[in-house]
Amino acid sequence: MSDFVDEAVLHLKAGDGGHGCVSIHREKFKPLGGPDGGNGGHGGDVILEVDRNTATLLEYQRRPHRKAENGAPGQGSNRSGASGADLVLPVPDGTVVTTLDGEVIADLVGHGTRLVVARGGRGGLGNAALASPKRKAPGFALKGEPGEKVDIRLELKTIADVGLVGFPSAGKSSLIAAMSAARPKIADYPFTTLVPNLGVVEAGQTQYVVADVPGLIPGASEGKGLGLEFLRHVERCSTLLHVLDCATYEPGRDPISDLEAVERELAVYGERTGVDLSDRPRLVALNKIDVPEARELAELVEPMLVERGYRVLQVSAATREGLKELAYALGEQVAAARAARPPEEPTRLILRPREIGEIPFQVIPLGNNVFRVIGDKPTRWVRQTDFSNDEAVGYLADRLNRLGIEEALAEAGATAGAEVHIGDEDNPVVFDWDPTVDSEQTVLGPRGTDPRLS
């Protein structure tokens, strides 16, 4: 069974932030030591990183659930909790990251390129960081935020310069084995190649990568044979090489009809995926000319192919005849394609910033004096609040009021006793709104309490 896997679905969870600490400094002869609770550590991110030594997504198919490390809670004496370690997942060069609905998130190309796919939760503030002139010794701390949960799909599109296309048993694997150090499985029956094979070829000063993909047959676009699923591996190829079998004895088969059939399947693939392969330079290798009848057939069809605009070379993977000329011809095409490319950008870290001018929150009337507040800040603040602590709840009320939610609710038509939903859509926190609370007053009372909630 092959170990090559080019698709995988991952279920990822970033680390949760550590909770802040509630602590009061206690020392002999210092009765008013003040708050000294440390902050919680941040949760670890989940990061995808291109690694040139990784060639398959097999490990992620076997273990699709991954989780980064949580942040540690804060401690007394102003000791912050340790941040959780990032979880770095190596992926092959050419991995495309999409949502489960098919929306492309990133195309990871180039060794060392990184993508943060799930951000760790921020650590909660300890009571030392929450102290203010109005609240000198807070009796509460903020909880750490949960890390992001994401489900993504990884799809590998091999990075190669030349893609070999043709019928099964046309000799593609033998050709790549003869031209490079690759050692694919070779046998005299169709569909021996079940996974893409890569080989590095040197032609003078030019070095390039050749990809041998499983063979195509008429009707591959309808699911016959191995279908078209492996054609994604030639999408990035700058040059395509038709490998045509001149020694086949199958009825209805000849190099011209084989080439036309493969071109039809390439066109169907382009229509389905939106990837136009028609503009890629094509060369034709008439293979197996070590067989006398095959050489005669190659001499017969070569002028027909040249008339169609193809550059044609007669080769034999078995005797290596014509392979040097083929390697240099492909090298010329690859060098020309590389010269036409824009200069490579340095390895980059891919971020997903929020839109500029993002609205901090929005009040949505649901009817019957029920309202929903959505927005990043209110949702995050609710997650950070310890609702078993009245002082923490009062602090949340102050923050929401300073953000302008009280005024927005009034403008939306909310009246006293309105039901207000804030937080995650599937599990919001429900408040009974009391517009008479004056959150600007000085809050005094025992730690952990709020006079407004008594």
From Swiss-Prot:
Gene transcribed to yield this protein: obg
UniProt cross-references to NCBIfam families, sorted A to Z: Obg_CgtA, Obg_CgtA_exten, PRK12296.1, PRK12297.1, PRK12299.1
Main location: cytoplasm
Domain Obg span(s) in chain numbering: 2-159
Subunit composition and interactions: Monomer.
Biological process annotations from GO: ribosome biogenesis
Keywords: Cytoplasm, GTP-binding, Hydrolase, Magnesium, Metal-binding, Nucleotide-binding
Hydrolase listed as a keyword: yes
Stated name of the protein: GTPase Obg
PROSITE patterns named among the record's database cross-references: G_OBG, GTP1_OBG, OBG, OCT
Cellular localisation: Cytoplasm
UniProt: Mg(2+) binding residues: S173, T193
EC top class named in words: hydrolase
Domain OBG-type G: 160-335
GO annotation, cellular component aspect: cytoplasm
Residue span(s) of domain OCT: 353-435
